[in-house]
């Protein structure tokens, strides 16, 4: 006899319900509930419940709810595409940050008109209130149903497809399933291979937008066919969608590529190649300010500065493991040093040299260059080391993803006993330095072992991961898990910073490594005279100079604080006869290493002021007749406010004070507050 009731826990409360109960009945009164979490796993609202289950609701406007809704939107989009292109071959349709995409193989790239048509068809599908219905299938059944879909067949036959983040939306490790789109008459009008979960029906998709299309390689490999990828976004309400679009508009204004060109900071000449930035004088001035302050702070924290070459023999990366685990991200080798006699016979074999993708192996050689004592530990090695990563041309993006990058790279060697204290002080150092650059809103991400890509024992990984987690939790910052996100040699903490418009950027990384010291046979003499392995900590505060430059440029929308600004003072004489007085004052600032310019152009004074305002210079200094007669200058700030007739000695001291304090000044009020403190 079937069990009449079952005992479950709902929202932490024990309940006795009918055995046929699902989430549909449990949460019937709350129309914002679109799915359930059963024993910690996201499931469809109509999933049968079992005795002893723990059930929690998933609201549409929650993080999980938005992800489910966006994934349902990918199905609606794919259905709409196949209405227009019945022969379109389907790839994958995962959820991404703030949106989703689906990959298609079609004869021609999608046009803007195609995207408009697809969006209209999606609206019709949504209004038709189609239900999403899951059904489990065998592999044989799945292959039969997807006989005309080669990319789906590949996923079905790939027993490790569930490990691919994009393919994991389609394939579960446990079982295969399809989702049918069922109309009001009960007819299946479309279907897709998918693990789910999904919305109860399409009408829960209340606010969406098709954004753009682009070419993409199937499963991210340039060896695979090219697909056409359509991106979209979906939100719980139309107000949320509008707010997102407003954020995009603001982000577009702050795009570092746009600002970099407008402010003459950097460029990417075709003659050099994609992903290889050239910094112009003004951009280099910002880089120098960043590096100079970083050097100052590293000296105060007892780091030893080193410098290493840009290329090395491949054997070094054989030892480190990079050639095994990271070769696809490295540039091809250069075969050098081979010698031949007159007959072409090799008399001295050559060696493969590589552009370095990482600095850590070279720092290990510095540690290993002589015998080390416990008295030297912790040993903190630091360099601004330029490394090279082979990024695909379609994946490079401004300064945030480049092929040549300079890391503020440090490797710290310490004892196991010193490890936790070193990590704690290091995290404090990182956060304080980022705050000095104007970033103040952080959370931490803990990246753990990828079971298919790691070196060393499970025990070592567990100890390293637990230590990092303990240090992260003691910081009192939010800690988010990043499963399988670690590099092959150790777990890491990433500092995620939110910028002025709420976007999240990964900046600093702190990685704990027991494995490379083992691979390089690093040792120190302990207090008892025994030879011991040091613990190694990899650390980059900026991540890379280029990426951090881009983050700051967008965070400040080009209006850097005075200490970072490419031009700190711009002089504008009211007329030519006042230029000598202004030049004399500017010279006194330049003697104090202030970055200054004077507008000697033939433009009218009003145009000079407009041009100066567009340049986002923190201090515009104006000199007219009254200023000259009183040995004074007048300030104009970014918001248009002014301070007139400031004596030159006072003005010079105040400018130097604001620069030294590293505070942001956009107005006369900001300026007065900064110099008064």
UniProtKB/Swiss-Prot annotation:
Its chief place of residence is cytoplasm
Which reaction is the catalytic activity of this chain? tRNA(Thr) + L-threonine + ATP = L-threonyl-tRNA(Thr) + AMP + diphosphate + H(+)
The Enzyme Commission number assigned here is 6.1.1.3
One GO CC term on file: cytoplasm
- Region of interest: Catalytic: 255-561
User: Where would one find coiled-coil regions in this protein?
Assistant: none
| Cross-referenced InterPro entries | aa-tRNA-synt_IIb, aa-tRNA-synth_II, aa-tRNA-synth_II/BPL/LPL, Anticodon-bd, Anticodon-bd_dom_sf, TGS, Thr-tRNA-ligase_IIa, Thr/Ala-tRNA-synth_IIc_edit
Annotated Gene3D superfamilies: 3.30.54.20, Anticodon-binding domain (3.40.50.800), Bira Bifunctional Protein, Domain 2 (3.30.930.10), Threonyl-trna Synthetase, Chain A, domain 2 (3.30.980.10)
Q: How is the cofactor bound?
A: Binds 1 zinc ion per subunit.
Task: List the disulfide bonds in this chain.
Answer: none
- Residues binding Zn(2+), per UniProt: 360, 411, 538
GO MF terms here are:
ATP binding; metal ion binding; threonine-tRNA ligase activity; tRNA binding
What name does this protein carry?
Answer: Threonine--tRNA ligase
Source organism of this protein record = Bifidobacterium longum (strain DJO10A)
Give the gene name. thrS
């Amino acid at each position: 006899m079937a069990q009449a009731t079952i005992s479950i826990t709902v929202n932490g409360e024990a309940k006795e319900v009918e055995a046929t109960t699902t989430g549909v009945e449990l949460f019937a009164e709350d129309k914002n509930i679109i799915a359930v979490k059963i024993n910690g796993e996201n499931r469809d609202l109509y999933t049968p419940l079992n005795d002893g289950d723990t059930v929690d609701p998933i609201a549409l406007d929650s993080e999980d709810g938005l992800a489910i809704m966006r994934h349902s939107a990918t199905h609606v989009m794919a259905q709409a595409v196949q209405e227009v292109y019945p022969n379109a071959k389907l790839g994958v349709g995962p959820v991404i940050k703030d949106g989703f995409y689906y990959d298609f193989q079609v004869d021609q790239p999608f046009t803007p008109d195609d995207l408009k048509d697809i969006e209209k068809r999606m609206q019709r599908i949504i209004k038709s209130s189609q239900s999403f219905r899951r059904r489990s299938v065998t592999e044989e059944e799945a292959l039969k149903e997807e006989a005309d879909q080669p990319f789906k067949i590949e996923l079905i036959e790939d027993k490790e497809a569930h490990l691919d983040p994009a393919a994991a939306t389609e394939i579960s490790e446990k079982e295969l399933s399809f989702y049918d789109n069922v109309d009001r008459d009960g007819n299946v009008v479309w279907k897709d291979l998918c693990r789910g979960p999904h919305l109860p029906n399409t009408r829960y998709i209340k606010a969406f937008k098709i954004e753009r299309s682009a070419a993409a390689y199937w499963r991210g490999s340039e060896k695979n066919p090219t697909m056409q990828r359509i991106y979209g976004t979906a939100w719980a309400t139309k107000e949320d969608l509008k707010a997102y679009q407003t954020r995009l508009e603001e982000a577009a204004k702050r795009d570092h590529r746009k600002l970099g060109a407008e402010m003459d900071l950097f460029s990417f000449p075709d003659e050099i190649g994609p992903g290889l930035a050239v910094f112009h004088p003004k951009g280099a001035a910002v880089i120098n300010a960043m590096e100079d302050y970083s050097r100052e702070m590293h000296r105060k924290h007892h780091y030893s500065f080193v410098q290493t070459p840009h290329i090395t023999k491949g054997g070094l990366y054989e030892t480190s493991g990079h050639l095994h685990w990271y070769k696809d991200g490295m540039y091809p080798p250069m075969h050098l040093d081979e010698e031949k006699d007159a007959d072409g016979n090799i008399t001295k074999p050559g060696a493969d040299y590589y552009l370095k993708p990482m600095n850590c192996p070279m720092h290990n050689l510095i540690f290993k260059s002589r015998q080390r004592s416990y008295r030297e530990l912790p040993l903190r090695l630091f360099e601004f080391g330029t490394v090279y990563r082979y990024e695909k041309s379609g994946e490079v993006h401004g300064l945030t993803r480049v092929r040549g990058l300079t890391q503020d790279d440090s490797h710290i060697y310490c004892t196991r006993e010193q490890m936790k204290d070193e990590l704690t002080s290091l995290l404090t150092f990182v956060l304080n330095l980022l705050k000095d650059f104007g970033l103040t809103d952080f959370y931490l991400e803990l990246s753990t072992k990828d079971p298919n890509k790691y070196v060393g024992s499970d025990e070592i990984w567990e100890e390293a991961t637990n230590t990092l987690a303990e240090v992260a939790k003691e910081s009192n910052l939010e800690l988010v898990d990043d499963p399988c996100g670690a590099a092959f040699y150790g777990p890491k903490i990433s500092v995620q910073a939110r910028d002025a418009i709420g976007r999240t950027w990964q900046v600093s990384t702190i990685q704990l490594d027991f494995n490379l010291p083992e691979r390089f046979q690093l040792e120190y003499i302990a207090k008892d005279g025994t030879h011991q392995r040091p613990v190694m900590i990899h650390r980059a505060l900026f991540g890379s100079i280029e990426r951090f430059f881009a983050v700051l440029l967008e965070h400040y929308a080009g209006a850097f604080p005075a200490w970072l600004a490419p031009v700190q003072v711009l002089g504008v004489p009211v007329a030519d006869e006042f230029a000598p007085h202004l030049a004399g004052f500017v010279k006194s600032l330049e003697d104090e290493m202030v970055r200054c310019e004077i507008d000697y152009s033939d433009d009218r004074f009003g145009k000079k002021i407009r041009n100066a305002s567009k340049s986002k210079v923190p201090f515009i200094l104006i000199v007219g007749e009254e200023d000259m007669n009183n040995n004074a200058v007048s300030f104009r700030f970014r918001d248009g406010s002014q301070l007139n007739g400031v004596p030159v000695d006072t003005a010079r001291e105040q400018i130097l004070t604001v620069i030294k304090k590293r505070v942001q000044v956009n107005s006369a009020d900001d300026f007065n507050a900064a110099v008064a403190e």
